[in-house]
């Protein structure tokens, strides 16, 4: 089986802890659910891979659409991993700015998307059920009255199920290798706009107040040999 690896042109993570701060240039990207002063928080990963690079692989390397695709992330550190959990992936509905911020920047960096906003400089609130009279078909997000925002995503399109997940048990290797074949296929065909993918924990573990589940992965800005990749495979 042949494998071609693509690297993100932008990646970040959005987090409720500072819902208007960007982390688009951080060396780590994080998913999690954890408390801060008793208030549940969440973190989600966003990645984008260029249309032109996907098309080049499909058109010039494979020559057809008989391929699989997965997002590969290498774990840097994990805290309070539960006995079992899943990570979920969806194609993102809305355009977002990557930014050049880092977690912990003072003052907060606003050069890219955040938990609350899709655009730079805290512009363009994410389109979500709480601020939109009628959400587009097959588009959703999550609602938390304490933390408005968190991105939006496709659940399906053109008969394709666009939700995928990877499940883990205690003591498993929790590097991510999560299938996104249908999403990449619809990006390639233009059936949905390519705004990348969002990765998140199970709903039950986000906004956690009883444990601190935090999984940090190397980002495209890492100085290691473990940046994220989109692995496209074919026979």
Residue ranges, per PLM feature:
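Secreted, disulfide-rich extracellular signaling modules
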Residues: 1-235
């Amino acid at each position: 089986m042949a494998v071609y690896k693509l690297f993100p042109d932008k990646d970040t993570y959005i987090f409720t802890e500072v819902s208007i701060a960007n982390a688009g240039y951080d060396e780590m990207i994080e998913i999690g659910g954890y408390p801060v002063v008793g208030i549940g928080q969440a973190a989600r990963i966003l990645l984008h891979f260029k249309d032109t690079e996907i098309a080049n692989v499909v058109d010039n390397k494979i020559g057809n659409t008989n391929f699989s695709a997965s997002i590969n992330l290498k774990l840097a550190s994990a805290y309070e991993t539960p006995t079992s959990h899943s990570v979920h992936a969806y194609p993102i509905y809305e355009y977002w700015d990557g930014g050049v911020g880092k977690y912990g920047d003072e003052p907060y960096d606003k050069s890219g998307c955040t938990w609350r906003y899709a655009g730079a400089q805290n512009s363009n609130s994410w389109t979500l059920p709480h601020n939109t009279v009628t959400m587009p078909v097959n588009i959703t997000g999550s609602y938390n009255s304490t933390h408005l925002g968190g991105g939006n995503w496709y659940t399906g399109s053109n008969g394709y199920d666009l939700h995928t997940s990877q499940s883990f048990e205690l003591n498993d290797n929790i590097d991510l290798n999560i299938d996104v074949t249908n999403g990449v296929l619809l990006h390639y065909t233009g059936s949905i706009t390519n705004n990348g993918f969002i990765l998140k924990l199970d709903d039950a573990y986000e906004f956690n107040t009883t444990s601190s589940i935090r999984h940090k992965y190397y980002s495209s800005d890492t100085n290691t040999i473990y940046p994220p990749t989109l692995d496209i495979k074919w026979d």
